[in-house]
Design a protein with these regions (language model features):
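Long recognition/docking surfaces used for binding and targeting
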Residues: 43-139
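Conserved S-adenosyl-L-methionine
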Residues: 148-261, 266-270, 326-328, 338-339, ...
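Conserved Class I SAM-dependent methyltransferase catalytic core
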Residues: 293-359, 364-373
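A short glycine-rich beta-alpha junction/loop motif
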Residues: 371, 569-578, 607-634
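Non-catalytic DNA-recognition/assembly elements of restriction-modification systems
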Residues: 425-498, 629-662
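Specificity-determining recognition surfaces
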Residues: 444, 448-452, 467, 597-625
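Sequence-specific dsDNA recognition surfaces
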Residues: 483-497, 514-544
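A short beta-sheet element
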Residues: 542-594
C-alpha cells in the first residue's frame, strides 16, 4: 500500500490540532485516565516513527477499512498490522518498552489515530513544527497526567541560563522526567551558538537522560526524536543504582560537563544495598564542627540527598551542576552534615531561593531553592565569593492553573517583548544578568541578589540567613547591648507529668488559642489525657511566656506569643510553643521584645523545614535580645504592665455588668 506524505507541514499549530484531536477522541471514548491517554498516544507516535524510519508503510488505514470501522464492523487487519508493528517497535526501543507492553486503546480509537497521522511524515516535516507541536501538546496534558515529573518551564530555563552550556559539552539529567532540562539546554545552544547548531549531532552525542519510569522516559525520548531523527541517549534506569553500571548503561564513563536535575522530593530509599554505596547513606558524626562518616548506614534517606552525591559523581572535575532541592536541605540542623559534604566536594557557585508557590500548579507547595555547584574534589581554594539570589515573580500565578502573569505598563497595558509577544512579569532574567555581572567580577547590588565570601558561610545555605538586611540587623545587635534569650530565661521543653495519667482531665492550649495582638491566651479546650493530640506537651504556669516555634506564622506579624495568667495556669500546651520561665530581665520588657521586628526577623531567618516551618531549640536560645538603657526598659515595661492591668480591669467591669443583670 503506497501513499504520499504531506511533507509541507510547517505550522506547528496544524500538527498540534491533530495531536489534540487524537488525545481528546481517545480520552472521550475509551475510558482511560488523562495519564493513560497520554501514555497510549506516545506509544502510537513511537510506532509511527519506527514505521517511517524503516520505510515499512504499515502505519496505514484504507478508506474502506476506516468506513467499515465507523459502521461498527471489526477490521482485524488493522489491529494485526499495528500489533505486529508494535512488536518490532518494542524491540527497537527495548530500553523504554517491556516485552509485555500492549496497545490499550480500542480498534475505533486506533483507526481514528492512524487516519489522522498516516499522511504526515514526522521524520521529514519541519523540525520546529513537530517539536513545538509536541511541546505545546505536552504542556496541555502533562500536569493532568503526571504532575510529579513536571518542572515549571521558567525554572528549567533559568537553571540552564545560569549554567550557560557550551557546544560539545556533555550534559545529563539523571532524573530527566519528560526531558525538560535537556530540551531547554538544546534550545539554549541553538540560540547562543555562532552559526547553525548541528541539532542531530548534539542530541546523539551530547544530551543524556535517565529516569526510572518507562512511560516518562518515553516522553523524553520522543521529544528528542522529534528534534533530531537519529540516536537519542534517554534510558530507563534507576540513576541511584551502582555507578559503574549506570555509566555502562549511559555509554559514557568519562564524566559530564553539566548535570541538570530536579530529583524526586521526599521519596524514601530504604534498601541497605543502595544506601551503603553512598557516603550520604551513612550517618555522620560531628566532632569539633567537622563531620566524619561513621560505619552506620541510615535505615532510610530521602532520594534527593542521594541524588546530590550521584550528580557530583557524574561530573568530571570542573564540571557544573544545577539541582532543585527542598529548602530543608539548605537549612535543617539535622542535615548540616549534608552541607558539610557539599563544601568538601564542590565549589558553591550560587544559591537561588524560589517562592513557595513555585510548584503549586504542579501539585506541591514545598518550598524549594536552586543549588549551583562546580565539582572541586581537591577543594584547595576556600576563598571565593558565593552568589545568592531570590526569585519573587515567576511569570505565572501560584494557583493550580499556573495562569501566566504579564508585565504591564503604568496604564495597565501588557508590555510586548522584542519578538512582539506579551512579556511575562518575572525576575528570572534579572537574576541571570546579576549572576553574569557577578561572574565578571562586578559588585552585586541588585534588589534580590548579593554575594558573601566562602569564609562567611556557616552551616546553612539559605538566602534569608545571609541577606544584607539580616546581616545589618546582627551588626547592629552586636554593636549594642544584647544577650541570648537562652541566657536570660529557662526554655522549658520537658513533657508534663500530667500526661502519664490517661484519664486525667486537662485544659489544652493550641497556637490558634492566642490573640497575637494582645499577647494573651483567649481559649483552651478540655480533654482527657488519652484524647489529647500527640503534640500536647508542656505544662504552663502563671507568669510564663509562651512563644511559637512551629507553623507558617513563625517570624511573621501573626507570630503567637502570650503571657500566661492564672486562668490558664496548669494547662497543657502544644509542642508548637516553647515555654519561657525564670526570667533574669523584666518579664514585660521581654514580652514586648518578643513581638518586635528585630525578634521576628531573627525567628523568620532561623525557620527551617520545607513543609512546616520550625525553629530549633538551639536557634531559639541563640536569638538576641536587645537591652536598651535601664530607663527605656522601665518605661516600656511600665506601659506594657499598665496595658495588661487596664485590659483586666475592663474585663472585670464587663463581668460586673453581667452580674447586675443576672
Amino acid at each position: 500500500m503506497n501513499f504520499l506524505f504531506d511533507t509541507q507541514l510547517t505550522k506547528e499549530d496544524n500538527l498540534l490540532k491533530k495531536f489534540e484531536e487524537i488525545h481528546d477522541y481517545i480520552y472521550a471514548n475509551d475510558g482511560l485516565s488523562p495519564q493513560q491517554t497520554l501514555e497510549e498516544f506516545v506509544k502510537i507516535l513511537f510506532i509511527k516513527i519506527y514505521d517511517e524510519n524503516d520505510n515499512l508503510n504499515q502505519f496505514t488505514i484504507s478508506s474502506e477499512e476506516w468506513n467499515e470501522l465507523k459502521s461498527g464492523k471489526l477490521v482485524h487487519a488493522i489491529s494485526e498490522r499495528i500489533t505486529a508493528l508494535f512488536e518490532q517497535t518494542k524491540k527497537a526501543y527495548r530500553d523504554i518498552f517491556d516485552a509485555d507492553d500492549r496497545i490499550r486503546i480500542s480498534a475505533m480509537a486506533l483507526g481514528f489515530t492512524i487516519n489522522k497521522l498516516q499522511n504526515i511524515s514526522l521524520l521529514n516535516s519541519s523540525q520546529d513544527a513537530k517539536g513545538l507541536a509536541f511541546q505545546k501538546f505536552l504542556s496541555h496534558h502533562e500536569k493532568d497526567g503526571r504532575g510529579q515529573f513536571f518542572t515549571p518551564e521558567p525554572v528549567i530555563d533559568f537553571c540552564v541560563a545560569m549554567m550557560q552550556p557550551k557546544p560539545n559539552e556533555m550534559i545529563i539529567d539523571p532524573a530527566c522526567g519528560s526531558g525538560g532540562f535537556l530540551m531547554s539546554a538544546l534550545r539554549y545552544l541553538q540560540q547562543n551558538t555562532e552559526g547553525v547548531l548541528d541539532v542531530a549531532k548534539t542530541v546523539s552525542e551530547n544530551l543524556f537522560g535517565s529516569d526510572i519510569n518507562k512511560s516518562i522516559a518515553r516522553i523524553a525520548k520522543m521529544k528528542l526524536l522529534l528534534e533530531a531523527n537519529g540516536k537519542t541517549n534517554i534510558h530507563c534506569v534507576n540513576s541511584l543504582e551502582d555507578l559503574d553500571s549506570l555509566k555502562l548503561t549511559l555509554g559514557h564513563s568519562d564524566g559530564f560537563d553539566l548535570v541538570l536535575a530536579n530529583p524526586p522530593f521526599g521519596a524514601k530509599m530504604t534498601n541497605p544495598a543502595v544506601l551503603s554505596k553512598f557516603d550520604l547513606g551513612y550517618k555522620w558524626s560531628n566532632q569539633n564542627k567537622e563531620y566524619h562518616k561513621t560505619k552506620a548506614v541510615y535505615p532510610n534517606r530521602n532520594a534527593e540527598i542521594l541524588f546530590i552525591e550521584r550528580c557530583l559523581q557524574l561530573l568530571k572535575e570542573g564540571g557544573r551542576m544545577a539541582i532543585v532541592l527542598p529548602n530543608g536541605n539548605f537549612e535543617n540542623p539535622s542535615l548540616e552534615y549534608l552541607r558539610y559534604y557539599i563544601k568538601l566536594k564542590a565549589k558553591i557557585l550560587a544559591i537561588v531561593n524560589l517562592p513557595q508557590e513555585t510548584f503549586i500548579p504542579f501539585g506541591t507547595g514545598v518550598k524549594t531553592s536552586l543549588l549551583f555547584l562546580e565539582k572541586d574534589t581537591p577543594n584547595k581554594d576556600r576563598q571565593y565569593p558565593i552568589f545568592f539570589g531570590r526569585i519573587t515573580k515567576l511569570g505565572y500565578q501560584g494557583n493550580k492553573n499556573g495562569t501566566p502573569q504579564y508585565l504591564k505598563d503604568k496604564y495597565g497595558q501588557v508590555v510586548k517583548n522584542e519578538l512582539g509577544q506579551p512579556a511575562l512579569d518575572e525576575d528570572f532574567s534579572e537574576i541571570v544578568e546579576a549572576y553574569k555581572a557577578f561572574q565578571s567580577g562586578k559588585k552585586v547590588d541588585a534588589n534580590n541578589s548579593f554575594s558573601i565570601n566562602y569564609d562567611e558561610l556557616n552551616g546553612r545555605f539559605d538566602y534569608d540567613f545571609y541577606s544584607p538586611e539580616n546581616r545589618k540587623m546582627f551588626t547592629k545587635l552586636d554593636s549594642g547591648k544584647s544577650v541570648r534569650l537562652g541566657d536570660i530565661c529557662d526554655i522549658i521543653k520537658v513533657k508534663s507529668k500530667k500526661l502519664k495519667d490517661p484519664n486525667k482531665t486537662v485544659e489544652y492550649v493550641e497556637l490558634s488559642d492566642i490573640n497575637t495582638h494582645a499577647y494573651e491566651i483567649i481559649n483552651s479546650t478540655i480533654y482527657q489525657v488519652h484524647e489529647l493530640p500527640s503534640r500536647a506537651s508542656y505544662e504552663i504556669e502563671d507568669g510564663d511566656i509562651v512563644t511559637a516555634i512551629a507553623g507558617n506564622s513563625v517570624g511573621t506579624r501573626k507570630h503567637a506569643t502570650a503571657l500566661v495568667n492564672k486562668d490558664f495556669a496548669g494547662s497543657i500546651c502544644t509542642n508548637g510553643f516553647r515555654v519561657l520561665r525564670n526570667f533574669k530581665i523584666d518579664t514585660y520588657y521581654l514580652l514586648y521584645f518578643l513581638k518586635s521586628d528585630v525578634f521576628l526577623k531573627q525567628m523568620f531567618m532561623y525557620r527551617t523545614g520545607a513543609a512546616i516551618p520550625n525553629v530549633s531549640d538551639i536557634d531559639l536560645a541563640n536569638t538576641l535580645i536587645n537591652l536598651p538603657d535601664e530607663k527605656i526598659m522601665k518605661d516600656i515595661s511600665s506601659k506594657m504592665k499598665k496595658a495588661f492591668e487596664l485590659r483586666q480591669e475592663s474585663r472585670n467591669q464587663i463581668e460586673s455588668i453581667v452580674l447586675e443583670l443576672a
